[in-house]
């Protein structure tokens, strides 16, 4: 069932960690809704900056928001003016003090979320879906990905009947828990309706044990 389950959720606590790092008994629902609103706002207001993910950490009366972006200069702005504006806007979603941290995504070409959003943008510009998908595969492999799988579903090319098409290059082992699989999803809003774009990127294996080698199985 590795092909059905969410690749990041499947690896939580093994090689992946949570995007929201906090624990709460009483105000769980309130904090959860705050996190959702913060993420939606950051994605919407910084959609031109290539936001990959938003991590939220909470401690005492402080909220630390880590924004992973491919274009940190656009977010920061002149002399940090952009950060202050976003920080001020985020303060309306929570009573606690907000700290904003910008993290640069070094290789946007191998970031699954950014690749999915790039394909969706191309589909909205009426670029042929096969061309957009194959270009994403070639670029990711060129920038060091071990494997990549891209899938699009919906009324592809304006067809009468919706269908599902996918392409893969390299290896994408979804069942292997030590495999570092990045996953991203985006929707293209076309005149024919929505088209879903899913991307899986394999960045190699996270091997446990000393010297970066996996423990050898016993011969029992």
UniProtKB/Swiss-Prot annotation:
Keyword annotations for this protein, in alphabetical order, are: Ribonucleoprotein, Ribosomal protein, RNA-binding, rRNA-binding
Q: Which GO terms describe its cellular component?
A: cytosolic small ribosomal subunit
Instruction: Using the record for this protein, list the coiled-coil segments as residue ranges, or answer none.
Output: none
The record's GO molecular-function terms, alphabetically, read:
mRNA binding; rRNA binding; structural constituent of ribosome
Q: Which InterPro entries match?
A: KH_dom (IPR004087), KH_dom-like_a/b (IPR015946), KH_dom_type_2 (IPR004044), KH_sf_prok-type (IPR009019), Ribosomal_S3_C_sf (IPR036419), Ribosomal_uS3_bac-typ (IPR005704), Ribosomal_uS3_C (IPR001351), Ribosomal_uS3_CS (IPR018280)
Domain KH type-2 intervals: 38-106
Q: Which Pfam families match?
A: KH_2 (PF07650), Ribosomal_S3_C (PF00189)
- Which GO BP terms apply? translation
Explain the purpose of this protein. Binds the lower part of the 30S subunit head. Binds mRNA in the 70S ribosome, positioning it for translation.
UniProt-listed NCBIfam families: rpsC_bact
The UniProt subunit note reads as follows:
Part of the 30S ribosomal subunit. Forms a tight complex with proteins S10 and S14.
- Family the entry assigns: Belongs to the universal ribosomal protein uS3 family.
Record-given protein name: Small ribosomal subunit protein uS3
Upper classification of the organism:
Bacteria, Pseudomonadati, Myxococcota, Myxococcia, Myxococcales
